[in-house]
Amino acid sequence: MRYAKAAAAGVLILILSSTLSSQNTPSDRVGGAAQILTADDVRAVLTTAATALGNDTLAAAVVDRTGNILGVYARPGADERTPDIAVSVARTGAMFANDQAPLSSRTVRFISGTHFPPGIKNTPNAALYGVENINRGCRVDVQGDAVFNAPFPRPKSIAGVFGEGAGSTPLPCEPSDTRGCARGGPMLDDAGETLPSVGITTGKADVFDAGQDQPGAVPVNPGGIPIYRGGKVIGGVGVAGVAANLAEYAATLAAAGSGRGMDFSEPLGKPGAVLIDGLRLPFFGTCTTITCIRNTLRTRPAGSFPGQLSSGTFVVQPRDGLQAPENYVLGPRASSLAGGLSEEDVRRIIDQSVAVSLRTRAMIRLPINQPARMTISVSDEAGTILALYRMADGTVFSSDVAMTKARNAYYFSTREGYEVLRSIAASSQQDKYTWTPEPPAGKGWAITARTISFAGQPLFPPGIDLGEQLEEQDSEPQHGPWFDLYVFDSKNACTEGPGASRGGNRAFLNQSGIVWFPGSVPLYRGDRVIGGLGVSGDGVEQDDYVSLLGSDGFHPPDALRVDNSVMTDAKGRHVRLPYLKLPRNPDIQK
């Protein structure tokens, strides 16, 4: 109880930041060098989590802001997957938070389902639909991690980083061998089997997002909390293997670090919480006031009891963390392909994207009227990443996302990508779709991440899930034309679909999965697609906005944009496919 009481007092500083409005970390103090988590810090955080609860099934993990595993603790009753789930929820807290607004794994679940708000039928999908399929640890380049300008670890599983015995040879994570890919979850596939690789744990039950039609009962994993020091994100802590309320209780106490000064030093600015479409994003339980959170933390959850560190073992011994690199994390460099993007082209696209970001009003930063801080990536025709640029304090999950979005934007805009998508739509297990008209000979439609998201959900059009409301009195909602591709992606980490060969090499390594939420455009020279631009780090409309303006000079011909085409289901109903969606009044107000 000594640890829990000390932590409860300190953690209120963090909780204040998610509830009340006052001041905020000034823009000129956002990003830059931050104190790293030391091995002693990690041990203190895990000790607090361990002593908060005595459950024999508990596991806890600490990661730095890059998602690098710094320490994992588990009790004998924890099942095989629980330590990796703790790592995954810790990453969710660390990699989604920013210096101006703490977000937790509860927050991420709220904004990643088939409905927004969760549990309300016939409402649009949440912005980050499919987020569990990102950050699975896929290889970035055939040359390995040496292509990065600074150390930037891939978020793999414990065995993928340390080996089967958490200290031997690491296991790989690539299309041909995914044994070392991240193992969050548990989440089930379409056959009811546990998916082997889930990068981000939110509590999503299965690929159909079961439970989204039950207001107040949507499944969630709320045990991932960011760790702050001096107003800057330096890592995250995750607790798993216990009931949701217990995991959140222990993780939030542990985030205070037993009084070691880990705190969000200033409360958030107006309006005191991040709002999307007028809805307050949750951080801790159902609380919306400081009094509620304080009382919750000061009162031990019913039926729980304190624990001892000696009741478990360190699966991964505590170690020091890393800084999260900023600016050019990779590149800039030219494509090696004839007629491809030059280094000058790449720099121009990055510079344009950064300039647009700095004038774009952020959705996830406070106080309001702050600039968006994006992570931006450019890919060439081979899927080679030519640049990865992280603006100061950009969300770290966005690095994997931006690179993958860039690759997807190019690949699915090629003729090969078109044929793969057309075939999947035509052979959908539940509904057969016809995609018309066909693009010009030898070409594909110019496709974005928004297009892929729109047609890749278990409901089509997205959010429409009551079949009896339709004129034809359908017995059940229909899956999207590319929902089967989402299922394939969920089962097969680090691939771009069943036909992603890029010239016939099925083991091609320049693949890192598919991103199912918006923020990308293909890059063209004339009517030839030569690469892709991926943007991540704020609201998805803001990501689309920066993608569009950042790619100035490389837009597709209007006649090749996918919004010239429609999907038609077996009953003859037509749905036009979207290209981009831009925010209203996107720029910072003077």
Where are these regions (language model features)?
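Flexible, solvent-exposed loop/hinge segments and secondary-structure transition points
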Residues: 23-590
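Bacterial N-terminal signal peptides that target proteins for export
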Residues: 1-8
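Bacterial N-terminal signal peptides
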Residues: 8-19
